[in-house]
Curated annotation (Swiss-Prot):
CDD domains assigned: AAK_UMPK-PyrH-Ec (cd04254)
Catalysis performed (reactions): UMP + ATP = UDP + ADP
Domain of life: Bacteria
Organism expressing this protein natively: Vibrio cholerae serotype O1 (strain ATCC 39315 / El Tor Inaba N16961)
Gene name in the database record: pyrH
Name of the protein in question: Uridylate kinase
């Protein structure tokens, strides 16, 4: 298969789940996984792609779970936001160790730890070839980091939101429970809603749909998958307004 020499996307928003960082550990951050992800992002930067990153916090804390146990949801979500900052600090450090310039911006002020989020500063940094990591979600409780990824993607005028998962894309059913589940190559936004496919929460998904922000779901654990997606090769599932 011939590889397109030019990337298909100039500016991307990469959404990493917190769970992706824990590797096989089951909790926390696996340094090996972190370094591998930093190297994959470095490859994109070397191709001239502008990279924004949103990381979840589920490897360190889950606010929704404690809310069910009686904790105030707002408090739980604030704790979850801080977990994403911890992951962001780890990712920034991994990128710096890989000799990649990176900035960490938080939606909630954390002076001395990271920069405050600024839309104009983020775009300027991206244009200068720096990776920008967006932490603390949207800065508001009740919104997921998937919502933050779509919001930041729209704000920075990214070409696509790349959602890194543990499976090869969007399936017609749970591929673990159903071996006959079909992997979709392309889907329209309405197909996802009609088929009730689990891509991301409804608030995040409808935000992307309303602003015609394409979403590509792919397997981050597959070596080279991120590069193949960015080069426009057949990898994962593309969700857009094209039928």
């Amino acid at each position: 298969m011939t590889t397109n020499p030019k990337p298909a996307y100039q500016r991307i928003l990469l959404k990493l789940s917190g769970e992706a960082l824990q590797g096989s550990e089951g909790f926390g951050i696996d340094p090996t996984v972190l370094d591998r992800m930093a190297q994959e992002v470095k490859e994109l930067v070397e191709l001239g792609v502008q990279v924004g990153v949103v990381i979840g916090g589920g490897n360190l804390f889950r606010g929704a779970g404690l809310a069910k146990a009686g904790m105030n949801r707002v408090v739980g979500d604030h704790m979850g936001m801080l977990a994403t900052v911890m992951n962001g600090l780890a990712m920034r450090d991994a990128l710096h160790r890989a000799y990649v310039n990176a900035r960490l911006m938080s939606a909630i002020p954390l002076n001395g730890v990271c920069d405050d989020y600024s839309w104009s500063d983020a775009i300027r940094e991206l244009r200068q070839g720096r990776v920008v990591i967006f932490a603390a979600g949207t800065g508001n409780p009740f919104f997921t980091t998937d919502s933050a990824a779509c919001l930041r993607g729209i704000e920075i005028e990214a070409d696509v939101v790349l959602k890194a998962t543990k499976v090869d894309g969007v399936y017609s059913a749970d591929p673990v429970a159903n071996p006959d589940a079909q992997l979709y190559d392309k889907l329209a936004y309405n197909d996802v809603l009609e088929k009730e496919l689990k891509v991301m929460d409804l608030a995040a998904f409808t935000l992307a749909r309303d602003h015609k922000m394409p979403i590509r779901v792919f397997n981050m654990n597959k070596p080279g998958a991120l590069r193949r997606v960015v080069m426009g090769e057949a990898e994962g599932t593309l969700i857009s307004d094209v039928q």
